[in-house]
Amino acid sequence: MVRALTYLFFIVVTVLGLAWFADRPGLLVIEWQSYHIDVPLFRATVLIVLTVLVVLFGLNVTRKILGGPGRFGRHLVQKRVSRGYDALRKGIFAVGAGDEALAARFAASAKRALPKEPLAQLLLAQSAQLSGDRRTAQRVFEAMSEKPETQLLGLRGLFLEASHDNQMEAARQFAARALALNPALPWPVHSLFEMQCRERDWHGALETLNTARQHRHIDRKTIDRRRAVLLTAQALDLEDTQPEKAAELALEAHRLIPGFVPAAHIAGRILASRDSAHKAARVLAKTWQYTPHPDLALTYAYVRPGDSPRDRLSRIKSLIILTPDHPEARIALAHAAIDAREWEEARFALQPLLAANPTARVCTLMARIEGGEKRDAGRVREWLARAVRAPRDAIWIADGVASEEWSPISPVTGKLDAFEWRVPADKPKSVGSDHFFEEISAL
């Protein structure tokens, strides 16, 4: 539109100019050596204008002729690029649809048409993955990881390939490189953290967790929970060799999550062994308020080595005041009363739990009471038989694996904080009770 208006304006100006010259006749005199030429001004003007137009036309034709090969080449390039992007688009759809043959064909076409296009390289790698050609996919991702523009994408592809081949050390290195390049990227943070936990690299996992906190990859509550678990894991590893350091770590975990039983249990156990009974009792009692647990009660009872069974019974009574009606409180009291040979008090503690369907632990405690107080072998066998059929008690469980002791990671998947204190869903296995009967009968 603008060009048409420009041409129209030029024509109007030319016509008006020629009309102006036609209304004002004159001569253009040219004298050169022995020549004398008289030309009307109007005719000279028209001749000059025509000459200029012819020259411009000739230059334009010459330029088009000389530039023809270049334009033709550019046309071919544009056509090839258009064909490449069309193949790229169709290849992405084919990968999404799971069409291996079509994806491979379009990936090859896109690669030929767009040799420097990162998306074409990505499509080639994805089509290779789809067809199971891991070597080609790895080669493409390696090439991408060497270019700044596609480095992170290449590292992620290499990480996934290494993880698929169970090459965990290589996968860890790729994730660490990606994390160093861009800590704000979530996937290397989460992936590296999970691998460090599986390898029990608690120190490295804490550093990665700190990176996640700085870049807000995880909410604050989850950060505190994971940090407490990692600190407790470190304390558990150092308890025998560096008890002071282990106690510091466990106490830090306890401050983060006061209701976390393993942290309080380890801290209380170490403090009690180092003549810090009062501090140990305070830590254990605080966690007991949140989560009554048999390990806490046992450690609390023996917080001062050398105490008599009656002293331990008195101490347990001071603990269960915090949660008097909780089943764990009654079981802890019954344990302490049995050790102190206070049979009636032990019976009274368990009485409310017998009204419902008592668990195996309650039944075995009743067997101990019958064997210790009355030496009634028949009643002992009766309670032991009930214990075999009774509902199971809570235990540490992770991914279907039950454990008497807490562990920071799952023995199946290596996931951090997988163990839960709960009742198993499966039915209890039958266990022999003869040995236990003999032990109780000897009371």
Per-segment meaning from a language model:
Residues A125-Q129, E142-S145, L152, R156-L160, ...:
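Alpha-helical adaptor scaffolds
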